[in-house]
Amino acid sequence: MSEGSISLCFLGSLPNDVVNFVRAVVRILADIRGIVVEERSAEELSLSNPPTLTLAALDNTEPGSPAICSLYAFLTHLCTALETIGRHAEVSSLQHVLDLCRTTTDRGGLAIIRDESSGWTSGPTQLQSVQSLIEAWLEALNAAESATQLPAPLPAKTPNTWPMTLAEKILVQHAFSLPSPQGVSVGELMRVSVDWVIASELSWVGMKHSMISIGEQPTVWRNDRFWLAGDHTVDPRTYHQPRVQELIGGMEDAKKTFKMTENQGSNYTILHTEFVRERAEPGMLVIGSDSHTCSAGAVSSLAIGLGAADVMAALATGETWFKSPESIRVEFSGEPAWYIRGKDIILYILKKLKRNTHAADRIVEFGGPGAKHLSCDARFAICNMCTELGAITGIFVPDEVTHQFISNRRHSRYRSNSVYFQPDSDASYAATFQIDLSEVESFIALYPSPDNVVPVTETLDMPLDGCFIGACTTTEEDLVLAALVLEVGLQQGLELAIGKRMVVPGSLPIVSNLRVLGLLDVFEQAGFEQPAVSCSLCLGMGADRAGHGENWLSSQNRNFKNRMGHGSIGHICSAAVVAASSFSMRVTDPRPLLSQIPPERYQTLLDKCRDWRSAEPAARRHPGKIAIANQRTKPAPTMPAYVEPYRSFQPPVPPSSDQPQSMKDHGKTSNGENGILISKVYALGDFVDTDAIIPAAFILESPTDVLLGSHCLEFTNPDFRSQVRAGLEVVVAGKAFGCGSSREEAPRALKGLGVKCVIAKSFSFIYGRNQPTIGLLGIVITDERFYDAARTGVAIEINPSARTVTVAGQSFPFVMDDMELALIRRDGLATAYKALGKGVFRSLCADVPGKGGCGQTQGTIYMQVSMSLRVTPAVSRD
């Protein structure tokens, strides 16, 4: 960094708010980045020659004067001055702030500067917004510099490296240390660094609760890697409600407290939509407090949904832990019809694989020669619904489609962190499935399961009360196609039958594109209400709820009981099928209408949307320039340059006396690790989902575990609460207990009611991880004899020390994972964090036998540079 100084001079009489703003920016530069800008008089400046910022009132300037007369000029000249003294990182941050000032609000900007001659027209409130952004982005430089720096990946595979799947390579690249220098095997524990944390306004409440409940305040490891979106319940129609105001206030408080760079507030985007379109990158590890976090697999991020406490700990530390999971491979071949998009394809996969079977607790890796025909929008829908398959997540192997999509982003900061891995040809998969895309047709998943899939032609003329096009699953290309279907129907004079119709795009940028294309008008003419961007009917807990007994056709991702509203019935399909069915309010084959749409027109509209994503702010304001923008030569897709993960390995470090207190000092679980739990059984069946355990309608009004428990299984098992209170404190369930959403409120509700243990044939991945995270004992037993004996009301004895469960005179062994045991001994992750601080994952991993601490921070870190090694001193990863 070169040495230098910057001087500031005020000329004439500027408004006080402008002077205060400029001086505030000067203080921010000094306080955050140590850059001193000295305020001098004109006479003093004549004696020296540093880079100078001369601010003047508009009426005090002469033609050709170098004085700065506008916000645009101030930020531009400040960047020039900083560039002169070698502060390139700060220049990049301020240029980004300037760009946000010029960008319209429906594109995520402030819309303060329309052109270079705007002057100091911004009022105090707008200038405060700019000041906050400058502070946030400069603070982000500090956060990035102090955060863990991942070793650079290798340009080629080295000898003696085990073959790995795509997910394994991403985890290995992010691991602090591996159990073996050759790589990782299924089931091995890793402490890993995360790239992004994402949350909704609703899950943020649970995240904060996990900290506040133990007397700690939430914190972030990087203020530029926390994506918080208001989408689940907030809506302009409910902004006046006290609980909604609390949620909005919670987001605003987080933005201010953490100096967040990536908080767009309420109803700008559904959590996943713009995050995947504009933030997630290939090779990243993303953690989110929402089960559809897996959507980012569309751009080859390993994106995994977890519970609120888990995600809060990752947000505070920049770390988390995983056991290396199995993967299954879905190999695409063939080419789909032009109108077959991602929703039809994932429904076809659900039809073939079924829920919670082959994909359960595994990662689904998508690839094959047919993948090149799938856009990133199609991949979004496919990955989004991998959670409905029961998978941990889904991820596409990055290819030319991925590379072009990421390269088309306008901001380099959101495409410069991409790392392109591909699975090894000899990688091991639990199963491989072939999907011929040419066989995919329009499907519908009938209530109440996403895998109850049949061709649309088998359900023709089913009467409907409502048609919904929306939710994150419904991408931009789906909305465009649905509008074209409606347009054809309107042109043919199709009448609109009585019924409810609603369309909710996934983000304001998509709304803006549809508006300029004239497609919002088409939806309006076809009778579709257009409320604000939100999850809407897909969640059924905000302003939009389906009525009791109503039969809906929806393009959302879930059709569980009570999902769209208490007592409602939902079937899911593509947006095109919903659009075709909305005229008669009966399920309709969309092909007659689709056949009237020129595929070339559809592609032209998608190309325009692509161009607007990468357009400069000025071009976005003038739809007339779109035709010019669209004349750009579309670059030919190119394959990315693939790399190999760096393998960090350090031999296990023996515990020393000055290391954090061992878990061995905490030998008792919340249920009594050395004691025996004696209770009675309450038996449930297979596939008990989190919507059933704690219905969404009760989450907002139940801030404590006890209040959540008062509504546990209220809709499906009204006697459950009284039975648990009467002493039936052990839940015995079947397959995939806790499937559905990531809501941590489900195990919290059980624990708050008084449930001591849940035993099941299997747990859904997120729910199964949430149990020990909140300190609730969970046991997997697959022996059918146990379930024959464990009926409601039967006495049961659980001996954690002996790892046995006894019922009806028979004893059944069980295995408890070491990490789960470590968490339960601490009564959950939040309590462990309170005791161990930001070293919580290092300490927890250190207590898992034979894991070597999942990566100690002592000794030396080996950083890969090209093909050579250089040794640098270790830095703290806390």
Curated annotation (Swiss-Prot):
Q: Where does substrate bind?
A: 173, 290-292, 558, 563, 742-743
Instruction: List the residue ranges of the region (Disordered).
Output: 626-671
Superkingdom of the source? Eukaryota
Asked whether the UniProt record includes Repressor among its keywords, one would answer no
Q: Which Pfam families match?
A: Aconitase, Aconitase_C
Q: Report the protein's function.
A: Aconitase; part of the gene cluster that mediates the de novo generation of L-homotyrosine from acetyl-CoA and 4-hydroxyphenyl-pyruvate. L-homotyrosine is a building block of echinocandin B, a fungal lipidated cyclic hexapeptide that acts as an antifungal agent. This is followed by isomerization of 2-(4-hydroxy-benzyl)-malate to 3-(4-hydroxybenzyl)-malate by htyD.
Q: Which family does it belong to?
A: Belongs to the aconitase/IPM isomerase family.
| Name listed for the protein in its UniProt record | Aconitase htyD
Species, as recorded: Aspergillus rugulosus
